[in-house]
């Protein structure tokens, strides 16, 4: 059975099927957690008329396509968000499964999957509600710290001369939580003092603690600046496009100076970029921290 997971031909498809289900569950979590509803019961129901959804129409990805984006019970429109999230999570996790079939490090596979699932959830919820639930930020930080103790390879610790791999990895995780959230707290406090209004929400500060738990303090610090850059790369073209099209500027959702914009999604995207692609490229820039963090 384990050969299925190690196969580069089968593993991504297996990951797609399994993680499409995780994407479906993420949709449930993203809808219910901000509203303080149970994610267990009741079962899935139509968002318009609350009719129960049969299991055969609730199959991830396929269900939305079969129904052509319309509810079977009342023919109301189903947001494409459900389909997009299920497909996105399935594709992302297929890539994770594929990348780990080479070295078969299932500790990193578990940690990477948990981290990606958490941050995709943050992106969805923060964009929709301007809030980051503590279950994702504080809960994610606790999960990252515990996983670091059990699976030291999360922080690149594979051997310690005195057999203290777990302690060294846990130290890196704890330092990431404290330095990451501490840096963003003071950036927000100073910016709030300078502009006379709240510049960063507490949710962003706690989210960076979660990022630090998985990425260490180097990844957390990178995520602050990487998140700001990612936000600028996305928001500046949108702002300019609205200025060039007067009809877009009249929209109630149009960007304007002084408008509150969620920072959490951009922190999350920068953290995912660091964790999966940029770690080896970015870490050499933090050589000055090597005395503090191996």
Where are these regions (language model features)?
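Functional transmembrane core segments of multi-pass inner-membrane proteins
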Residues: 15, 108, 114-232, 239, ...
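Membrane-interfacial, low-structure loops and terminal tails that flank and connect transmembrane helices
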Residues: 45, 158-165, 246-255
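Transmembrane helix-loop junctions in multipass membrane proteins, especially transporters and channels
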Residues: 32-40, 98-102, 153-156, 192-197, ...
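Membrane-proximal soluble regions of multi-pass membrane proteins
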Residues: 26-81, 254-257, 263
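Interfacial loop-to-transmembrane junctions
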Residues: 202-203, 240-273
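Long, highly hydrophobic alpha-helical transmembrane signal-anchor segments
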Residues: 1-34, 157
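Alpha-helical transmembrane segments of multipass membrane proteins
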Residues: 22-27, 89, 93, 147, ...
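Multi-pass membrane catalytic core of lipid/isoprenoid biosynthesis enzymes
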Residues: 52-108, 112, 204, 225-226
């Amino acid at each position: 059975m384990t050969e299925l997971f190690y196969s580069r031909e089968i593993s991504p498809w297996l990951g797609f099927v399994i993680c499409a289900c995780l994407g479906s569950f993420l949709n449930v979590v993203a809808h219910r957690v901000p509203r303080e509803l149970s994610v267990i019961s009741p079962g899935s129901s139509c968002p318009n008329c609350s009719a129960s959804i049969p299991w055969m129409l609730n199959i991830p990805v396929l269900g939305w396509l079969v129904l052509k984006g319309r509810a079977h019970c009342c023919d109301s429109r189903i947001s494409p968000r459900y389909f997009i999230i299920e497909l996105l999570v399935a594709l992302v996790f297929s890539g994770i499964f594929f990348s780990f079939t080479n070295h078969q490090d299932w500790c990193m596979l578990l940690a990477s999957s948990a981290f990606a699932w958490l941050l995709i959830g943050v992106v969805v919820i923060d964009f929709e509600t301007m809030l980051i639930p503590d279950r994702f930020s504080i809960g994610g930080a606790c999960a990252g710290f515990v996983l670091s103790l059990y699976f030291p390879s999360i922080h690149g610790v594979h051997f310690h001369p005195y057999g203290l791999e777990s302690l060294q990895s846990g130290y890196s995780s704890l330092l990431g939580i404290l330095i990451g959230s501490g840096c963003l707290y003071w950036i927000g406090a100073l910016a709030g003092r300078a502009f006379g209004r709240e510049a960063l929400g507490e949710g962003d500060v706690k989210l960076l603690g979660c990022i630090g738990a998985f990425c260490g303090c180097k990844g957390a610090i990178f995520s602050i600046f990487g998140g700001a850059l990612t936000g600028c790369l996305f928001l500046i073209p949108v702002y300019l496009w609205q200025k060039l099209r007067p009809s877009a500027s009249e929209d109630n959702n149009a960007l304007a100076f002084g408008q509150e914009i969620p920072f959490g999604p951009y922190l999350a995207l920068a953290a995912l970029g660091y964790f999966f692609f940029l770690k080896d490229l970015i870490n050499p820039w933090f050589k000055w921290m090597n005395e503090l963090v191996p």
